[in-house]
């Protein structure tokens, strides 16, 4: 009897391996050292479905040279377990090696993109000792797609593999060498600070800094606006909109301020048809998710990937705005969606009337636009529901009718001065019925005709100022990076995330470049502008694309990049000490500024946040001449919100989640306390009244030997904590009173307040 052939399918993640195994047959789950894999039989063939866990291999130096040595270009691929926190990768490598020994043929079933091709190829090459395999390509994890991909396999795309390897190598070349160069510049002046800059992060931070400096240097320019408040709460604005000359504005105002009527001199009515919005590419999905739900681009990408792995949507990392051309494929999906309680009626009409979807301009050689493929069978999290709903509605709306809007522009005359008012309304909802997220202004004007007289209630003149350019948001920056050709659809969200993590940028609703970020860019711009030149980065991105399509060779691009970088680093080394001095000067100024809390009430000096081995406090910069000092708690992360207390005008600090006034004598902290002898229950010494940033409290007179404290209004004990034996006391939270352990935060036991306890309180 002939031996049964064994096929090994390598997936990107364990969850995808399970999906693929169950789609191909009745799979049996097994494991090697805790690593799951699946076995099944299909068409007389034994199939093993196993997985990687993302990238199993990473780049390191071939030889460990002295600490901080650069430039380094001699690198190799090794198991990713060398990275901290990635030790678990070894188990997956060993499992694939073991499973590959009995395999006769191999399939790669990782994500169909550059990273997926590289993950699969590396697993095949370094774990299985093979260079060739069949390639399963799919854009969704539905059973039908998986079976089709298995029965009609492709070959490995070595252009994608080369492009993937080249991207990782270039990122290593630039990231490691430039970061070491910066740190060595600081070491050259006998200082130390961890610094980093990357191939794409540098140019991205550079144009963010450019915008930040525009905002800092912006000088507001005054202008005047004249408006007429009309009957029925209508508001008309002078046709000039902005008066840049105050005298001219006031002359117009004086001329018409007492007028009580306006004459309609012109009416223009226009209708516009608004086509449905095209289906989502990743960048547009990220922007819309942030705009409507404030979900960050990085989180949107992660949620979309999870929805894809659960076979609810198609592959999310796509540039396409076009749905698949295969009508049968779309009809199969619509036949599933028509059973949905909300989307069903729309899917039914699309099927019944054979409606065709609109397309956007963007294309992707591998994947169609993001679209739904199934209905959730399990409960989704709130954010998953929002992203799924956004994609579902956008998919269905692409098939729908145009929306129709009517716009009314009216010109009125007030004593020879022309004013304008406008209205708009929706005539036909069309696709907006389904994808209702974009806001349509509905401004109804009363029926008006030429020569009508309208009552004027009031004329106003308002001085305004021009506003600085807006900062980018985490969503708008994705569009800007795409426009400038920096990064890829899969990496742009991560680029911004790294800039935030490194302290170069903060996200408080918009992206603000920190003083640290500005000082790094100013240093590089002055001494080594090539590092932050986006033309060089864009050129490399274009070459990576050419590698992908086999138009140029990988080695040629890497050799050219190495020569280019060596030249940059040679110049950098010549100026190393100057760069270090300039960078430290900027960093010291930044650090000093970051520690300033406010002004000293005694001498007018700066109040500075000081961290000392004996504790934390705020002290005057003019010490020892000025001895103003405010103690701070030992625990809790401190932030400086640049606010002052309404009651005493002292600076406010945010410690943990609480904003507090640093002044212990603040009127808001004063309490009336009866004089009474109190004894410390811990050591027997006398308890004395003390004042701190949180207000007055009792503390042991034997401090610092005894650190016992208790609040002035000590909470009444209502029982013993079943978890730690501490006292249970009545506390008050944002949802009302409850019983909690007095040993919080060490013990977080809580319970509901009983009725009799409420009555006693």
Swiss-Prot record:
Residues 157-569 form the Topo IA-type catalytic domain. Monomer. The record marks 55, 167, 171, 317, 502 as: Interaction with DNA. It comes from Methanocaldococcus jannaschii (strain ATCC 43067 / DSM 2661 / JAL-1 / JCM 10045 / NBRC 100440) (Methanococcus jannaschii). Belongs to the type IA topoisomerase family. A zinc finger (C4-type) spans 600-626, 680-706, 721-747. One of its GO terms (molecular function) is DNA binding. This is DNA topoisomerase 1. The keyword Protein transport does not apply. Mg(2+) binds at residues 12, 111.
């Amino acid at each position: 009897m002939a031996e049964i052939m064994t096929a090994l399918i390598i997936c990107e993640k364990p969850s995808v391996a399970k999906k693929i195994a169950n789609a191909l047959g009745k799979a049996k789950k097994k494991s090697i050292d805790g690593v799951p894999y699946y076995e099944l039989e299909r068409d007389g063939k034994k199939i093993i479905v196993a997985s990687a866990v993302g990238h199993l291999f990473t780049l390191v130096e071939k030889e460990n040279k002295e600490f901080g040595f650069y430039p380094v270009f001699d690198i190799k691929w090794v198991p990713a377990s060398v990275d901290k926190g990635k030790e678990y990768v070894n188990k997956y490598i060993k499992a694939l090696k073991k499973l590959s020994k009995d395999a006769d043929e191999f399939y790669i079933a990782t994500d169909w993109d550059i990273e997926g091709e590289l993950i699969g190829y590396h697993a095949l090459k370094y774990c299985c000792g093979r260079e060739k395999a069949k390639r399963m390509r799919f854009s969704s994890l539905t059973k039908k797609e998986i079976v089709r991909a298995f029965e009609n396999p492709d070959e490995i795309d070595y252009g994608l593999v080369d492009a993937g390897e080249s991207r990782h190598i270039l990122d290593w070349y630039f990231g490691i060498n430039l970061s070491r160069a910066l740190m060595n510049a600081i070491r050259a002046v006998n200082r130390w600070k961890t610094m980093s800059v990357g191939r794409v992060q540098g140019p991205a931070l550079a144009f963010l800094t450019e915008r930040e400096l525009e905002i800092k240097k912006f000088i507001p320019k005054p202008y005047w606006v004249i408006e007429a408040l009309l009957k029925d709460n209508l508001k008309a604005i002078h046709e000039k909109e902005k008066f840049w000359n105050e005298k001219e504005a006031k002359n117009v105002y004086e001329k018409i301020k007492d007028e009580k009527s306006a004459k309609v001199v012109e009416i223009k009515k226009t209708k516009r048809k608004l086509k449905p919005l095209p289906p989502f590419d990743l960048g547009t999905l990220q922007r819309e998710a942030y705009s409507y739900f404030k979900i960050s681009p990085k989180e949107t990408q992660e949620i979309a990937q999870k929805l894809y792995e659960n076979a609810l949507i198609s592959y999310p990392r796509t540039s396409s705005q076009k749905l698949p051309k295969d009508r049968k494929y779309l009809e199969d999906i619509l036949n599933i969606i028509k059973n949905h309680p909300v989307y069903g009626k729309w899917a039914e009409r699309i099927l019944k009337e054979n409606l065709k979807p609109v397309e956007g301009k963007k294309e992707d050689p591998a994947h169609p636009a993001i679209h739904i493929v199934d209905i959730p069978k399990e409960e989704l999290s709130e954010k998953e529901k929002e992203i799924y709903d956004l994609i579902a509605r956008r998919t269905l709306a692409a098939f729908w009718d145009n929306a129709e809007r009517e716009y009314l522009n009216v010109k009125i005359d007030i004593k020879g001065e022309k004013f304008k008012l406008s209205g708009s309304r929706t005539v036909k909802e069309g696709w907006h019925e389904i994808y209702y997220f974009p806001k349509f202004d509905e401004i109804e004007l009363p029926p008006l005709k030429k020569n009508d007289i309208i009552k004027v209630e009031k004329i106003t003149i308002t001085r305004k100022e021009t506003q600085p350019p807006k900062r980018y948001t985490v969503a708008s920056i994705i569009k800007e990076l795409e426009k400038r050709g920096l990064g890829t659809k899969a990496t742009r969200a991560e680029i911004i995330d790294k800039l935030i993590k490194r302290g170069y940028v903060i996200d408080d609703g918009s992206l603000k470049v920190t003083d640290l970020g500005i000082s790094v860019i100013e240093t590089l711009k002055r001494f080594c502008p090539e590092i932050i030149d986006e033309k060089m980065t864009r050129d490399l991105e274009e070459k990576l694309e050419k590698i992908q399509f086999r138009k140029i060779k990988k080695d040629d691009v890497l050799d050219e990049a190495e020569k280019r970088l060596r030249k940059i680093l040679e110049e950098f080394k010549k100026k190393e000490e100057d760069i270090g001095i300039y960078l430290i000067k900027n960093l010291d100024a930044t650090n000093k500024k970051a520690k300033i809390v406010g002004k000293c009430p005694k001498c007018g000096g700066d109040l500075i946040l000081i961290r000392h081995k004996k504790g934390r406090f705020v002290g005057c910069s003019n010490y020892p001449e000025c001895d103003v000092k405010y103690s701070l708690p030992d625990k809790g992360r401190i932030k400086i919100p640049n606010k002052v207390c309404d009651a005493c005008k002292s600076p406010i600090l945010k410690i943990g989640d609480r904003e507090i006034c640093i002044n212990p004598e603040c009127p808001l902290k004063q309490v009336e306390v009866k004089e009474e002898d109190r004894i410390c229950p811990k050591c027997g010494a006398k308890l004395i009244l003390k004042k701190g940033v949180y207000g007055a409290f009792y503390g042991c007179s034997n401090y610092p030997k005894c650190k016992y404290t208790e609040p002035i209004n000590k909470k009444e004990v209502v029982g013993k904590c079943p978890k730690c034996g501490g006292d249970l006391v009545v506390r008050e939270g944002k949802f009302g009173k409850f019983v909690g352990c007095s040993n919080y935060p060490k013990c977080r036991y809580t319970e509901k307040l009983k009725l009799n306890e409420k009555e006693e309180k």
